[in-house]
Each structure stands twice: as C-alpha cells, then as structure tokens.
C-alpha cells in the first residue's frame, strides 16, 4: 500500500527538517529571523510544496579563504529546511543501493570506518605483507 502524505504530516515533517537545519546554527541571525515567524514560515513552505509552486530563492555567494580560497554558494535558510525535508524522505531509499565502501554523509560510516575498511582490504590483498598505516 502506498504512503499517502497529508498536509498535516508535511507540516510535522517540515518542523523536524527545521530542527535538523538549525542544528549548530542556533545563534545565526537568519535562523532567529526564520524562527521568529516559525509556524508562518513552515506553513508557507508547506503550502507551496503541496501546491507544486515551491521555487528556491537565489543563493548567497561569498569567498572563503581557508583552508584554500574558494567561492561558496549558500542556500537561503528556508531552502535548507526543504533540503533536509527531501533528505529525510529519500536517504534510506538511496543508501540501500550504495556499496559497503560508500562513506560520505552516511551515519555510522565516517572517516574512521573508512580507514578500518581500507586497512582490512589492504591486509586481505597483500596476504599480510607488512604495511603500517
């Protein structure tokens, strides 16, 4: 049976996405500005998603100097909430299709897990030939 999303469930899912989007950014002015009208903002996003009229706003461009100079295009906070909503809906579907050696942005598969897997593969393929990581 197919899952039927209701507008009320969409609003609850948007609130959960908002909590994820604001993590580690609670003191940023754009988060506080969004939070001042939280329910109105979430309802506005929910309405536009529900009616298929949602359009992302232009990104903010800035230069980061460290660790190397580069141009960064940052999404507006309301769009980040939608990104988290989309991720929450789809990540399990996609992660099931990834090979075991996919590590980027997957819970429980960080750099330490990747290093352990690499070491295991090296030892298997080198027939225990001396190699130190």
Where are these regions (language model features)?
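Amphipathic alpha-helical blocks
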Residues: 35-58
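Short, compositionally biased low-complexity segments
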Residues: 8-24, 56-60, 88-93, 123
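Conserved pre-motif C helix in the palm subdomain of viral-like polymerases
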Residues: 69-99
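Short acidic (Asp/Glu) and glycine-rich catalytic loops that position anionic groups and cofactors
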Residues: 19-26, 63-65, 95-97, 129
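Short, glycine/acidic-rich hinge or "gate" loops at secondary-structure transitions
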Residues: 98-107
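Non-catalytic, polymerase-adjacent accessory regions of viral genome-replication enzymes
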Residues: 1-43
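Conserved catalytic palm subdomain of right-hand nucleotidyl-transferase polymerases, strongest
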Residues: 27-29, 112-133
